């Protein structure tokens, strides 16, 4: 009941903040910060804008998902722009077996969609160095990858696998991934996050074998601090998808248990991780990825538990 109330309240609040359909295609002038790395498509640039000021005579507490056709320059995270926009309400198709776009926009706190009016002046006011630091770093890594490799689909694939920016992957490549059954590998999930955590832990265990540091006390606390810091940083750089956040929550819970020298059953740890995610974002339960992630992990735990019983 508590979860239902939280979901209902959050959804009602977000729905009330959305751009009204009665004002579709209305032009407004806004001042806002680029909130995420832009995606270049054929003839247009897609990006999210966090509005600070607007002529709309109503608050816009969320993101605007915008397209800019023939943009003179690529907007970068942290830049403050004054733009004239033509907005539409948050709408989308919801066909059986396909993604519910309107619900997806709602989960991402997008209050409206639209495009930059080409004939109106667009002004870059300043680059706010402290705004959107994680997104700025993601964009910088993606740019370095693009500059280091010859142009081609491999650039977008590496950007997707490293910092979770998959918007530049060509449609034909997605079709090839789907046909060969490897599309899921493009999503940074629990496999990647767990691998990162275990690799860092392995490096630390190697360091403890070095005599100058091998005799230091507090090694368990040091391991936990370093592993959590690196894992959290990787999840943020990867875009903080639901599967990655689920794994991070489980890593945090396991670390706490190790620090307290207490062990909980894995299924209870999984349940606590789900509760943490729902507390942080009640709308997570509306995502297919949430259920796939937790159900798949629960199934693996059941299989492992059954396997241990057979061995016994």
Language model: regions and residue ranges:
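Hydrophobic alpha-helical transmembrane segments in multi-pass membrane proteins
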Residues: 114, 165, 169-312
């Amino acid at each position: 009941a508590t979860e239902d109330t939280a979901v209902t309240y959050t959804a009602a609040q977000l729905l009330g903040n959305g751009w009204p359909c009665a004002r579709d295609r209305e032009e407004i002038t806004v001042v806002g910060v680029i909130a995420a790395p832009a995606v270049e498509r054929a003839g247009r640039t897609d990006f999210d804008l966090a509005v600070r000021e607007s002529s709309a005579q109503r608050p816009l507490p969320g993101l605007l998902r915008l397209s800019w056709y023939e943009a003179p320059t690529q907007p970068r995270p942290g830049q403050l722009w004054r733009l004239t926009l033509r907005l539409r309400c948050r709408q989308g198709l919801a066909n059986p077996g396909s993604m519910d776009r309107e619900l997806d926009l709602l989960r991402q706190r997008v209050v409206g969609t639209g495009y930059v009016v080409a004939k109106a002046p667009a002004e870059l006011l300043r680059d706010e160095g402290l705004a959107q630091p994680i997104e700025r770093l993601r964009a910088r890594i993606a740019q370095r990858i693009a500059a280091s490799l010859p142009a081609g689909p491999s650039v977008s694939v590496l950007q997707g696998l490293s910092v979770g920016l998959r918007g530049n992957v060509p449609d034909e490549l997605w079709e090839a991934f789907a046909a060969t059954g490897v599309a899921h590998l493009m999503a940074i999930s629990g496999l990647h996050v767990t691998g990162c955590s275990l690799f860092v832990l392995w490096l630390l265990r190697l360091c403890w074998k070095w005599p100058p540091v091998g005799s230091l006390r507090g090694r368990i606390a040091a391991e936990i601090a370093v592993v959590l810091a690196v894992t959290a940083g990787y999840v943020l750089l990867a875009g903080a998808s639901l599967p990655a956040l689920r794994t991070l929550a489980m890593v945090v819970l396991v670390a706490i248990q190790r620090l307290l020298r207490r062990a909980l059953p894995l299924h209870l740890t999984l349940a606590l991780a789900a509760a943490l995610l729902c507390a942080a974002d009640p709308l997570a339960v509306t995502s297919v990825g949430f259920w796939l992630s937790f159900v798949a992990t629960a199934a693996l735990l059941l299989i492992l538990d059954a396997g241990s019983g057979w061995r016994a």
